[in-house]
Swiss-Prot record:
HAMAP family found in the cross-reference section: UPF0246
Organism: Streptococcus pyogenes serotype M18 (strain MGAS8232)
Name assigned to this protein: UPF0246 protein spyM18_2163
GO biological process, one term: response to hydroperoxide
Family statement: Belongs to the UPF0246 family.
Domain of life: Bacteria
Length: 243
């Protein structure tokens, strides 16, 4: 069985379905630090204006006082990649695929199933804090490595910020899809192409119930197709021709 890892997103939208917020034990230490930070501290840590930091501060305070509602993570996050993932009107098989084979890597919650209930928050591995004297990446590395050992065949749709959270020896069987546009024989890639394509790729995997590495090579989605000559055992390249 294939396991997919996807990143979080800064952009969020509030779904209709909500749950009580239950915070994992490993997240408690981070919450304690975040709630102790002033608006000015948060603005510096997030590199945002103080007005925006006030909103984030309130979210942390609400979490600490157990006032926060929680929402299925794949519905709460609404970045460009998420908007290109099929999230509504799923078949029973697609719903099972999304909730059992897709996991989200978070700097606050750890690695969680796509439908895990989470609260609105802003946090990533660029957030400049120390937990028990460790960076966020060092703090989460044992948890992330344990997940990798339990799920050796991972399809990683993660961005570069996650590269060194996992130890190298845990990623021997990983495959990272790469998405490129071809125009007049020239290949290019950029953030927008990649984010849209990640969502479309995951949707195609769900719709086709892909369970083997070879099944990924036959996918055609949003104009992309597998390019064997540019691909390696650990990097599957998908090309889209531009007019």
């Amino acid at each position: 069985m294939l396991t997919f890892l996807i990143p979080t997103a800064k952009e969020m939208t509030t779904p209709k379905e909500s749950h009580p917020h239950l915070l994992p034990q490993d997240s408690q230490a981070i919450l304690k630090i975040m709630t102790a930070m002033t608006t000015e501290d948060l603005a510096k840590s997030y590199r945002i204006k103080e007005e925006a930091a006030k909103k984030e501060q309130q979210r942390w305070q609400d979490m600490a006082s157990q006032q926060s509602l929680a929402y299925p993570a794949y519905q709460l996050f609404n970045g460009l990649m998420y908007r290109h993932i099929k999230r509504d009107k799923l078949t029973t098989q697609e719903q099972a695929y999304l909730t059992q084979q897709v996991y989200i890597t978070s700097s606050f919650y750890g690695i969680i199933p796509a439908n895990h209930p989470i609260a609105e928050h802003r946090h990533d591995f660029h957030t400049r804090i120390k937990i028990e004297g460790q960076s966020l990446k060092s703090y989460w590395r044992p948890c992330y490595n344990q997940f990798a050992k339990e799920h050796p065949q991972v399809i990683s749709l993660l961005s570069s910020e996650f590269d060194d959270v996992f130890s190298k020896d845990c990623k021997q069987l990983w495959i990272s899809p790469k998405f490129m546009a071809e125009k007049e024989g020239q290949f290019k890639t950029h953030s927008t192409i990649s984010k849209k394509a990640r969502g479309a790729f995951l949707t195609a995997c769900m719709e086709n119930n892909c369970q083997t590495v070879d099944s990924l090579k036959s996918l055609v989605f949003a104009g992309f197709y597998y390019h064997p000559d540019l691909s390696t055992d650990h990097e599957f390249v998908y090309i889209k021709k531009e007019a």
